[in-house]
Structures are given as structure tokens and as C-alpha cells.
């Protein structure tokens, strides 16, 4: 098969594109000297990508540094294994970059685009770099068998589809304990109150200010550089085991990652002291701190409530109610609530008498000691 090569001018360089047919042939042949780089936003990559591709989404702050020429391409990878793979192979492999749809890329801004900038930088570093004509959308339309999709296809056909999060179209699975597929960190727009009634869909689109320096948010908030700058956030507490710290290599943010999934077996309370210390460090430096998990309604809420309990000497109920007044769709899993009850006892705090109307009793256990607790409704409206 003859590969179609099309010259694409940018700056003073000449880039070459590869066709989707050529790429399909290389994948069919099992070409091990092929390095695919997906230049789309991470949520699109997580949703679906060409097999074996590694993601190289570029935040605005790092794009500016790349334009200035003082940042190597390897620094753009958020995962160590991707960075190592690129470093080992970029000098010998054929590097092919793709975005969502690059068929008209050469007619637009050329070197001002992300593809143009990356191609020039890769060639400057001695790589044999090309871009994929038509991008991911064209390849997926013609050769879907060589695309990896993160939708859960194991559900019975008779079962209704589960909610799909806005973060890259990841489908939530109720029978998986993995972080991304946890049914407990569910779509905020589908959250329900303690009586099962739907909460308002008019939830804040930005992180919620709990205290003047403390913000509660979701994964999307942690990737929005404009939002982080607007709220003066320089510290980011990531309460997930596998969501990347997107701006870690930029050097302008301090991260702490708590590797906890939203599952009944997880002991989040063991991380309370270091999480509280991290938040206090941000406060001491007059910086904003964002506490986030995936959907911003379970793990990050638990940590935020624990912080309020310790620093403001509040009972679990009172601290929970403060957070709920700020963000009505919070919903920590019951075992995390049990750990907060343990934490309340450790702090020597006690909840005041609750005069609210009784609701059906709920029970949960904590993974640390397997005690069983009876819980009244913690939701106040």
C-alpha cells in the first residue's frame, strides 16, 4: 500500500501526515516501531483512543513554556510509564500524533496549533514525527476495531444504561470496585437526597468555597487552569488513586494524592491527619486549596468534613450540615460516615440532640474495626 504524504507548512518547517489507512496497516502488521501520541484532552483519551496510544494533553501553562522552548516534550506526560516509554522510543520509532480532527489543520494556524508546535518540537529533538490526517474521529469511523473504548460492555442487554459522567463519557459501573467505575462517586446531576428524592440539578459549575481558603470540587475543576487561578488555588488535594495531577510538572501547584477508592473496604480515616496538615499548610501560606475526588460528592466531602470537625471543634452532624448548605448534592458512602463517627469520638466531640423528624434507620460498618453503627438522617434542609 502506498502511503499518502502531504506537506504541511508551519513556521519554517515541513511536517508530514500519515493516512488512517496507513496507520491501520501498521497496526494490523503489529509494527513495534510505532509510537502513537494522543493530543486530545485527557477526558476524551480516557473515553476512547487508538490502541497503544499515550496521552499528551497539554495544559495552557505548559503550552506557553513549550512555545518558549524551555520545556522538553517528555515533561508533558503526566504518567511516569508514558514518560519513560516516550524517552526510550522517541529516537528510534516513527512518532504519529493525532487530535480529534486534523484534516484541515494545515489551513488554519499552522505552527500556532498544538499539533504544529509539537511536531516542530519533536523534529527539533531529532524525532521522526508525523501527524494523522483526519485525526481520531476519521480513524475511529473507518477502523473502530483498533480503538480502545472505556465503556462497560459487560452489562446485561436487559439492564438500563447507567449514568455517564461528563468526564470523558466514562460509564459508571455498580459492580466494580475500581475508582473510575465506582457507583458511589456518581454523577452529581443524578444525586438524590436521603429520602431518595432527586436533588436540584442547578449545582455549582465551579468549586464550592467552604471556607475562605478551602474549596470543594470534582476532577473537572482540578483540570481547569482558569478556575484555579481565579480562586487563588495553589494547593490541590487529590482523593483518588489514579486521576493524574495534571499540572504537577508545571511547578506552580503543590499536590498531595490520597490513593483511596470510593468503596466500603477503604479506610480513608487513616489519611485524615496528613490531609488536614496539607490543608493547613495552604492556609498558612495564604493560598487556596482544592479538595477533589472524581465527582466531588463522597471522598473529598469526607476529608472536608473531617477538617471542619478538627479545626472548628464541630460534631460530625454540624460539620456535615455546613458542607451540605454549601453544596447540596454531597453523598459520602456510609462507611466513610462511620469513619467520621470514629473520628468524632477520637476528637472527644459529640453531636447535639437531634430534634429532626426520625427517618428509617441506616447501618454501616467501618473497615478499621468492623463496628456496626446506627445512623439517623444526616441530611438537613
Swiss-Prot record:
Residues of the Rhodanese domain: 30-148
EC number in record: 3.1.3.16, 3.1.3.48
Domain Tyrosine-protein phosphatase: 206-349
CDD domains: DSP_MapKP, DSP_MKP_classII
GO molecular function annotations of the record: MAP kinase tyrosine/serine/threonine phosphatase activity; phosphoprotein phosphatase activity; protein serine/threonine phosphatase activity; protein tyrosine phosphatase activity
Observed effect of gene inactivation: Mice exhibit a persistent state of mechanical allodynia following plantar incision. This allodynia phenotype is concurrent with long-lasting spinal phosphorylation of MAPK1/3 and MAP kinase p38. Tissue at the local incision site also shows prolonged expression of phosphorylated MAPK1/3 which persists through to post-operative day 12, although levels of phosphorylated MAP kinase p38 are normal.
Induction remarks: Up-regulated in local wound tissue 5-7 days after surgical incision.
The keyword Hydrolase appears for this protein: yes
Subcellular compartments: Cytoplasm
Sequence segments annotated as region (Disordered): 176-203
Reactions accelerated catalytically: O-phospho-L-tyrosyl-[protein] + H2O = L-tyrosyl-[protein] + phosphate; O-phospho-L-seryl-[protein] + H2O = L-seryl-[protein] + phosphate; O-phospho-L-threonyl-[protein] + H2O = L-threonyl-[protein] + phosphate
Chief place where the protein resides: cytoplasm
Active-site residues, Swiss-Prot/TrEMBL: 293
InterPro entries named in the record: Dual-sp_phosphatase_cat-dom (IPR000340), MKP (IPR008343), Prot-tyrosine_phosphatase-like (IPR029021), Rhodanese-like_dom (IPR001763), Rhodanese-like_dom_sf (IPR036873), Tyr_Pase_dom (IPR000387), TYR_PHOSPHATASE_DUAL_dom (IPR020422)
Keyword annotations: Cytoplasm, Hydrolase, Protein phosphatase, Ubl conjugation
Ranges of biased composition (kind: Polar residues): 189-203
Family recorded in the similarity comment: Belongs to the protein-tyrosine phosphatase family. Non-receptor class dual specificity subfamily.
Quaternary data: Interacts with MAPK1/ERK2.
Functional summary from the UniProt entry: Dual specificity protein phosphatase, which mediates dephosphorylation and inactivation of MAP kinases. Has a specificity for the ERK family. Plays an important role in alleviating acute postoperative pain. Necessary for the normal dephosphorylation of the long-lasting phosphorylated forms of spinal MAPK1/3 and MAP kinase p38 induced by peripheral surgery, which drives the resolution of acute postoperative allodynia. Also important for dephosphorylation of MAPK1/3 in local wound tissue, which further contributes to resolution of acute pain.
Protein name: Dual specificity protein phosphatase 6
Native species: Mus musculus
Lineage, highest ranks first: Eukaryota, Metazoa, Chordata, Craniata, Vertebrata
Amino acid at each position: 500500500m502506498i502511503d499518502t504524504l502531504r506537506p504541511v507548512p508551519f513556521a519554517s518547517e515541513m511536517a508530514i501526515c500519515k493516512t488512517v489507512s496507513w496507520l491501520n496497516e501498521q497496526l494490523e502488521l503489529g509494527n513495534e516501531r510505532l509510537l502513537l501520541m494522543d493530543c486530545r484532552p485527557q477526558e476524551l483519551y480516557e473515553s476512547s483512543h487508538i490502541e497503544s496510544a499515550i496521552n499528551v494533553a497539554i495544559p495552557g501553562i505548559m503550552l506557553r513554556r513549550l512555545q518558549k522552548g524551555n520545556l522538553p516534550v517528555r515533561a508533558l506526560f503526566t504518567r511516569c510509564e508514558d514518560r519513560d516509554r516516550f524517552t526510550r522510543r522517541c529516537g528510534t520509532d516513527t512518532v504519529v500524533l493525532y487530535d480529534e480532527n486534523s484534516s484541515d489543520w494545515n489551513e488554519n494556524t499552522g505552527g500556532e496549533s498544538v499539533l504544529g508546535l509539537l511536531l516542530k518540537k519533536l523534529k527539533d529533538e531529532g524525532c521522526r514525527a508525523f501527524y494523522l490526517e483526519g485525526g481520531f474521529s476519521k480513524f475511529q469511523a473507518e477502523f473502530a476495531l483498533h480503538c480502545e473504548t472505556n465503556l462497560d460492555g459487560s452489562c446485561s442487554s436487559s439492564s438500563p444504561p447507567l449514568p455517564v459522567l461528563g468526564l470523558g463519557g466514562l460509564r459508571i459501573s455498580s459492580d466494580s470496585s475500581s475508582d473510575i467505575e465506582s457507583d458511589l462517586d456518581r454523577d452529581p446531576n443524578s444525586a438524590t437526597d436521603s429520602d431518595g428524592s432527586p436533588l436540584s440539578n442547578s449545582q455549582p459549575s465551579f468549586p464550592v468555597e467552604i471556607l475562605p481558603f478551602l474549596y470543594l470540587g470534582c476532577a473537572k475543576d482540578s483540570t481547569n487552569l482558569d478556575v484555579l487561578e481565579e480562586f487563588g488555588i495553589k494547593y490541590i488535594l487529590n482523593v483518588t488513586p489514579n486521576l493524574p495531577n495534571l499540572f504537577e510538572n508545571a511547578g506552580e501547584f503543590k499536590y498531595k494524592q490520597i490513593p483511596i477508592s470510593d468503596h466500603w473496604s477503604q479506610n480513608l480515616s487513616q489519611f485524615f491527619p496528613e490531609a488536614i496538615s496539607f490543608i493547613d499548610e495552604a492556609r498558612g501560606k495564604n493560598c487556596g486549596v482544592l479538595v477533589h475526588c472524581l465527582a466531588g460528592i463522597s471522598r473529598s466531602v469526607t476529608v472536608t468534613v473531617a477538617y471542619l470537625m478538627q479545626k472548628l471543634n464541630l460534631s460530625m452532624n454540624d460539620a456535615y450540615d455546613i458542607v451540605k448548605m454549601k453544596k447540596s448534592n454531597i453523598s459520602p458512602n456510609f462507611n466513610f460516615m462511620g469513619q467520621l463517627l470514629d473520628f468524632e469520638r477520637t476528637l472527644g466531640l459529640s453531636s447535639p440532640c437531634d430534634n429532626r423528624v426520625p427517618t428509617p434507620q441506616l447501618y454501616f460498618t467501618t473497615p478499621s474495626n468492623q463496628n456496626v453503627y446506627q445512623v439517623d438522617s444526616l441530611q438537613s434542609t
